[in-house]
From Swiss-Prot:
One of its GO terms (biological process) is hibernation. Keywords: Hibernation. The lineage of its organism: Eukaryota, Metazoa, Spiralia, Lophotrochozoa, Mollusca. It comes from Helix pomatia (Roman snail). This is Activity-dependent peptide. Up-regulated in CNS of active, non-hibernating snails suggesting involvement in the regulation of hibernation and maintenance of the active state.
Length: 13
């Protein structure tokens, strides 16, 4: 998944 910095972990699959 993807997330915004400071909101979600910046991890990508």
């Amino acid at each position: 998944g993807s997330g915004a910095s400071g909101s979600m972990p910046a991890t990508t699959s």
